[in-house]
Amino acid sequence: MGPIIFQMPENQIIAEATPKTAVAKPAAGVPVFQTTIKDSITISGVGLHTGASVNLTFRPAPEHHGYKFCRVDLPGKPVIDADVDFVGDTERGTTLVKDGARVSTIEHVLAALVGMEIDNALMEVDGPEIPILDGSSLPFIELLERVGIVEQSAERKYFVLQENLTYEDPSRKTEMLAVPSDEYRITVMVDYNSDLLGTQHASLYNVREFKSEIAGCRTFVFLHELEMLLQHNLIKGG
């Protein structure tokens, strides 16, 4: 799928396209079979907005499992699929909601899994929010590299884009365009209406460049936004 163009003149979240939905068929070097991690591993930190101390454990998952979050601190340990149908809020982060259970600020974890080309994983968390760590997905990448990746028996499923796909949200001044292509390519333009930053562009031509090109990008905030965010009960852990 490419090029994908995201135009975000305001403070919007950059979305990632996963490799398993980005190409019509596996290209050279692209995994044919699904993958998961070799073993469980835990990382701890503080939630950006809630300020809660949280333990996050990555666990191997079976084929066709996808990405799921489990709130082990809640009765029944509810599981929330990392699916767009369960997105409940995108204010300063992405929050998944299912049957009353919530997990927030999931974007860096999911970006790391996509960047590592991991298809199946269960994330157990004992709080309402994923730890922010250094504000990027790099610590999650490095953590997953420590346990390694294992290939599974089932083949990956690839979505074939037959025609241009567009999305526009005038209220958020966001535009997205997906164009059929035999190559993986993502192009992003963002403009925060800042004289200091100006208009910024970024491109990714191979998901395996994610660690070196994208993973270290960190969440930031403008100084003039701090009071407003605090008034909205946010960035308690920032």
Locations of regions flagged by a protein language model:
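Short acidic-hydrophobic catalytic motif
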Residues: 2-238
